């Protein structure tokens, strides 16, 4: 029996990946595809439904993204969200106009409870709006099923043709009944059964890897992070000792992290595990480098070189495991994607290395990889690890990297993490760490003047890392961090707390 599928046509909206995650939460497999996908290609995939995403364009723009008009004639249920709804209205003969008052933020919504889309949804609720254009007149054959004070067509539908549109964003948490609305589209309109589970996904991946690899050899670049760790465990379950894991220790890890990774994978999982100590080479390469992008590129290039050297020592292998995630795939295929920071990944390996990639999680999101890890029996301390950048502490030490600065930020970071765990906040806070901003300040310790480094503490709350707010850590916990760092970490005499959200800031300082 073929697995149910929902296709999400990507028009460049900021919440597109969030839509996919919400669909998956309802146990339905979905894929994000470019808006240029043809009606014929859609028919071949045989989806249960289509979702047209939001986007920054206007339907009247010269180069505005449009899907094929034939898509609306396929007899496949369609939900248009924001721009996707405007495009549906415009294409089918409705009228879209520029709003006098742009709607942005939480908005009071009134809906028709007789609509399948709003089954068991309160008539009055709050939704999240983010638009400049709006649907002024619904196309012929459509019924208006939702309104706001400034939006006469906040929702519309042609029930006979299973075409639905909403001007608001049901995928974001600020829309009170957003999850229920999406669930209604998937189950009441598309008649999905909900046949997608992590257990089934893992079984299929293990079987596919086993059939692909056979008796051949596989190499895994293991960082100790969630993605590569869970990928290594899954592949190891599929092929056993035919997998060899290479762990490049670049000397930019958190306190005791290298030893911890080695113990987990060599001793607990009994994998073929090779640890390469390359600290001197990396610190030598970073000497005098202060620009954050140059630091990232230097680390990435040397990582590739070290990994390639080790691979040649091992001998012939046919496959390489990578912990690539679905957002990487989506962003690489999206015309509107922009590079904010270069990403450190083994994907930059030389083309002349003859191997085939195994990417078991290339269709999963981060939270789904964590679920997969728990299903596979991966220890919780790995599954719930803090996100950690590939360049490691090199991007948490601003300016030039030195052994002294690394030691200071490493010790301070260990204290921050320890105090968060002691306070029982480690599951509530998405990410927390110490930063050395390369700022010296005057202090007094005992009867002596000091001139030492400032340490920044960064802690954020988030559900998806696309947006984040600074964590309201209790003052007594912050006080404990500050007191311990100043007393226990030589070279630090001032502690500051970062209270900036994302946006405008990014999570990492570099």
Swiss-Prot record:
Subunit description: Homodimer.
Enzyme kind, highest EC tier: ligase
One of the record's GO cellular component terms: cytosol
The name this protein goes by in its record: GMP synthase [glutamine-hydrolyzing]
EC number of the protein: 6.3.5.2
Catalytic residue list: 82, 169, 171
Any matching Pfam family: tRNA_Me_trans
Ranges where the Glutamine amidotransferase type-1 domain occurs: 5-195
CDD domains given in the database record: GATase1_GMP_Synthase (cd01742), GMP_synthase_C (cd01997)
Residues covered by the GMPS ATP-PPase domain: 196-385
Pathway: Purine metabolism; GMP biosynthesis; GMP from XMP (L-Gln route): step 1/1
Species this protein is from: Alkaliphilus metalliredigens (strain QYMF)
Function recorded in the entry: Catalyzes the synthesis of GMP from XMP.
Keywords from the UniProt entry: ATP-binding, Glutamine amidotransferase, GMP biosynthesis, Ligase, Nucleotide-binding, Purine biosynthesis
Binding site for ATP: 223-229
Cited HAMAP family: GMP_synthase (MF_00344)
Single annotated GO MF: ATP binding
InterPro entries: Class_I_gatase-like, GATASE, GMP_synth_C, GMP_synth_GATase, GMP_synthase, GMPS_ATP_PPase_dom, Rossmann-like_a/b/a_fold
Catalytic reaction equation(s): XMP + L-glutamine + ATP + H2O = GMP + L-glutamate + AMP + diphosphate + 2 H(+)
